[in-house]
Amino acid sequence: MKLYLTSVSSCLSEIESFKSLINRQTKLVILPFSYHKEYIKCAEDIWYHFDREPNPDSIFWATARPFIDAGIDPNNITVINQYTDNIAYIKYKLTRENTIVYLPGGYPENIVENIMKYDLLDTIKQCEIIVGESAGSMAPFKEFFVYKDQDYADYKKFKGLNLVKGMTFVPHVTLSNPFIFSACRRFKKQRRKTIIFCAMDGGYVVIEDGTVIEIHDVYTFELKRKKGIRIRDIISSLR
């Protein structure tokens, strides 16, 4: 399995290793599992928000554009509707040869909850390529955490999909935000051996079979043991 994890998917068309995977037969499956339950709560919401015909609230083309720019044919893009698609159909779509599975932004805990709810974890583990954006970049790890922002009142740790161990990913990092540092400290106290990748917008990490093979505009934090619990920036804008 190869994972492309990023804060914003617009950078995908600039990642040569990603573009090299794509041809006219490449298929994209969008799993809209991350959205707030008041935003998408029924089949009609999926159809409306992912309508290919223009409407003020459709996010289909904005969601698909980075993949189309990277070379995917729009006709090869499928949006899963968990309210109408049966599980056998979803599993078939996810595991076809030459298929990219996309986990979009939103709420990472919702991704995990829905994948478990629809009994898709073993299927997800069989996927060849997964792209995770924002919330979707956090869910693949054994554990992930959120920190205080407009969506969360405070730090909170969640169990992830356990596709990758020994590390975790934090998107949309601005180094001037004091909450990210305190959240990193709290997480490292609980999980000392875990590497934390903090990606600015445009940053990404590529992981293949549990090994990091590519990194760009990402800060990596570790626990400094000899001087107590503190966070130290050890990699900055490594290309």
Identify the residue ranges that each predicted region occupies:
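Class I SAM-dependent methyltransferase SAM-binding "motif I" and its flanking Rossmann-like core
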Residues: 110-116, 120-176
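Short glycine-rich anion-binding loops that position phosphate/pyrophosphate groups of nucleotides
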Residues: 34-36, 106-108, 136
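C-terminal and late-domain segments of enzyme folds
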Residues: 1-24, 30-57, 146, 150-239
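Structural motif
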Residues: 29, 100-104, 131-132, 169-170
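Short amphipathic alpha-helical segments and helix-helix/interface helices
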Residues: 19, 64, 91-92, 117-124, ...
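Flexible gly/pro-rich beta->alpha loop and the following alpha-helix that scaffold active-site loops
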Residues: 72-129
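General beta-strand structural signal in soluble alpha/beta enzymes
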Residues: 5, 78-79, 102-103, 131-133, ...
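Class I S-adenosyl-L-methionine
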Residues: 38, 52-91
